A protein has these predicted regions:
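Polytopic alpha-helical membrane-helix bundles and their juxtamembrane interface segments
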Residues: 23-106, 119-266
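N-terminal secretory/membrane targeting signals
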Residues: 1-29
Length: 266
């Protein structure tokens, strides 16, 4: 049994490593990657891509430690960091070889990973109570409004301030749902203490951690700085926000999953 578990884990790591190597080679094939020592934005892309890889392996391997009802949540956490890691390989290539902001790759990443993060709220509540599907769809609607608004502004399809306002409205809608809406009420009424604690921490990440993204948008597009300074500020702020929000979300899910699993064994 032990050898089977070890073999399974090694297979996961091996498969992930092979896929990662292929992705890295494909990203590097589009240009010669030369990372300069004073390119702090490029350095942040490399550091964060590696942190996301490590997080992915961790979340997938830790699935064996938790009960069945938490495995899906940990799998989603691993998928979030996996998808982000793959996109970061391409984004860092775009930045290092061209010096331009990888807007399209970043928003493709967000259009996949941010809805997955919102699904985590639904999954963590579904593990302990019956949750109406309306909660899921309201979180998805808020997420799409937020992301589409941001993209239309950054891609030049809409006035920057108008797009900023639309994105902020989507974010506010999400905050309402997790602080005062049905998701918040289910958490307060039916969740055990450990789940309530995790839910509360997750929603403060969405409040404080996600507030970093509007700062990146503001310093990247709305301050009137030089194109170089604006691009540097935008990408460093976005990169740090991605690291904090995606990895921290997964670690919170992992902590409550392990805690609830161990409590059930006693």
């Amino acid at each position: 049994m032990i050898f089977s578990s070890i073999k399974s884990k090694l297979a996961v790591v091996s498969t992930f490593g092979t896929s990662l190597a292929l992705t890295t080679n494909q990203a590097a094939a589009s240009g010669t990657l030369v990372l300069k020592p004073d390119d702090f934005v490029g350095i942040s892309f490399w550091l964060i891509s590696m942190a996301l890889v490590a997080s992915t392996v961790f979340f997938f391997l830790e699935r064996d430690r938790v009960s069945a009802k938490w495995k899906t949540s940990l799998t989603v956490s691993g998928l979030v960091t996996l998808v982000a890691a793959v996109h970061y390989f391409y984004m860092r290539d775009v930045w290092v070889t061209t010096g331009s902001t990888p807007t399209v790759f970043r928003y493709i990443d967000w259009l996949i990973t941010v809805p997955l993060l919102m699904i985590e709220f639904y999954l963590i509540l579904s593990a302990i109570a019956k949750v109406p599907t309306g909660v899921f769809w309201r979180l998805m609607i808020g997420t799409l409004i937020m992301l589409v608004g941001g993209y239309l502004g950054e891609a030049g399809y809409m006035n920057l301030w108008l797009a900023f306002g639309i994105g902020m409205a989507g974010w506010a809608y999400i905050l309402y749902e997790i602080f005062a809406g049905e998701a918040s009420k289910i958490n307060a009424q039916k969740a055990p203490a450990s789940v309530q604690s995790a839910f509360n921490t997750m929603r403060w990440i969405v409040t404080i951690g996600w507030a970093i993204y509007p700062l990146g948008y503001f310093f990247g597009y709305l301050t009137g700085s030089s194109p170089t300074n604006s691009a540097n500020a935008l990408n460093i702020i976005y990169n740090l926000a991605d690291l904090l929000n995606k990895v921290a979300f997964g670690l919170i899910i992992w902590q409550v999953a392990v805690s609830e699993t161990e409590s059930a064994k006693k």
